[in-house]
């Protein structure tokens, strides 16, 4: 039987439809409905949010398919799910289940410490994390249709997401200012496919959307990432580890849409209750840094 794969154009077009929106992590149907009612453009179905994965330790794997199905049956918006880096079978199972996107995610324990999935070999579009333009273009070269900053998941600390967004956008500006004869050396230095470096030079931007993720915990955090050039926002632990998830979810969606309306963001931030408890980056041991799990 002939294998079907989706084209880059179709996959990237699907991801473009989420631009400007918020994608929320959920662990059951009830949370998925809260996210949908708050205005999320998609949900990420998983067994535990990143802060719980971090606290539990051990090996984090793909969610129980029952949870993914429960979420898919509960909402009408797109449903994403996470597979371990390099785990072909987890990704194929999720594709067979009919999820709308797969996140090849460093939040889960990598299954392969050398190879990422060849995402162009799948029909379903993939989202992947990146910290710099080299990682971004390598993932696109493998077939990713959507990117997100890695940040540092489960910390409620926005500093790493800010660092990664600034790094990627700064390197895009650097490439855009290069002469054509400098591009091959740039590709070598970034460890990136030459043709994609050339495309960055032509477009002046990434050929796929790049969302912010990893540490978004407040409406102001979401607005900040949009100010820095994010195409949208992923919120992991920040919603359902807060005192008032429904109110936090709605406020973050509105702050993402109206990210330059500072008066509105101030109003949205009033009386929300406590956000999730954050972690200072200096308190993380090197082996606990999820962002370092891919390459």
UniProtKB/Swiss-Prot annotation:
Gene3D superfamilies recorded: Aldolase class I
InterPro entries xref list: Aldolase_TIM, PdxS/SNZ, PdxS/SNZ_N, RibuloseP-bd_barrel
Keyword line: Lyase, Pyridoxal phosphate, Schiff base
Sequence positions that bind D-glyceraldehyde 3-phosphate: 166
Origin superkingdom: Bacteria
EC numbers for this chain: 4.3.3.6
GO molecular function: pyridoxal 5'-phosphate synthase (glutamine hydrolysing) activity
Function in brief: Catalyzes the formation of pyridoxal 5'-phosphate from ribose 5-phosphate (RBP), glyceraldehyde 3-phosphate (G3P) and ammonia. The ammonia is provided by the PdxT subunit. Can also use ribulose 5-phosphate and dihydroxyacetone phosphate as substrates, resulting from enzyme-catalyzed isomerization of RBP and G3P, respectively.
Protein's name in the database: Pyridoxal 5'-phosphate synthase subunit PdxS
Species, as recorded: Listeria innocua serovar 6a (strain ATCC BAA-680 / CLIP 11262)
Pathway recorded for this protein: Cofactor biosynthesis; pyridoxal 5'-phosphate biosynthesis
Catalytic reaction annotation: aldehydo-D-ribose 5-phosphate + D-glyceraldehyde 3-phosphate + L-glutamine = pyridoxal 5'-phosphate + L-glutamate + phosphate + 3 H2O + H(+)
Subunit annotation: In the presence of PdxT, forms a dodecamer of heterodimers.
Binding site for D-ribose 5-phosphate: 25, 154, 215, 236-237
Gene Ontology terms: biological process: amino acid metabolic process; pyridoxal phosphate biosynthetic process; pyridoxine biosynthetic process
Family, per entry: Belongs to the PdxS/SNZ family.
Active site per database record: 82
Pfam families: SOR_SNZ (PF01680)
């Amino acid at each position: 039987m002939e294998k079907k794969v989706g084209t880059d154009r179709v996959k990237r077009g699907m991801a473009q439809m989420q631009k400007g929106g918020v994608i929320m992590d959920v662990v059951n149907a009830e949370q998925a409905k809260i996210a949908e009612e708050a205005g999320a453009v998609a949900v990420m179905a998983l067994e535990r949010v990143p802060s719980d994965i971090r606290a539990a330790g051990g090996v984090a794997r793909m969610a129980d398919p029952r949870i993914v199905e429960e979420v898919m049956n509960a909402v009408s918006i797109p449903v994403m799910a996470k597979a371990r880096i390099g785990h072909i079978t987890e990704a194929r199972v999720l594709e067979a289940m009919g999820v709308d996107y797969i996140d090849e995610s460093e939040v889960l324990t990598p299954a392969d410490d050398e190879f990422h999935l060849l995402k162009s070999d799948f029909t379903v579009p993939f989202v992947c994390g990146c910290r710099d333009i080299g990682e971004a273009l390598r993932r696109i070269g493998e077939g990713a249709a959507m990117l997100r900053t890695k940040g540092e998941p489960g910390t409620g600390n926005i500093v790493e997401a800010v660092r990664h967004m600034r790094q990627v956008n700064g390197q895009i500006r650097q490439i855009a200012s290069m002469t054509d004869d400098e591009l091959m050396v740039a590709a070598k230095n970034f460890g990136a496919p030459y043709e994609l470096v050339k495309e960055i030079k032509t477009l002046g931007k990434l050929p796929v959307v790049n969302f912010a993720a990893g540490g978004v915990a407040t409406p102001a955090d979401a607005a900040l990432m949009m100010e820095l050039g994010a195409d949208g926002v992923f919120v992991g632990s920040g919603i359902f580890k807060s005192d008032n998830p429904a109110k936090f979810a709605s406020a973050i969606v509105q702050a993402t849409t109206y990210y330059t309306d500072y008066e509105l963001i101030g109003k949205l931030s009033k009386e929300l209750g406590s956000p999730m408890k954050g972690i200072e980056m200096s308190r993380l041991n090197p082996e606990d840094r999820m962002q370092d799990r891919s390459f």
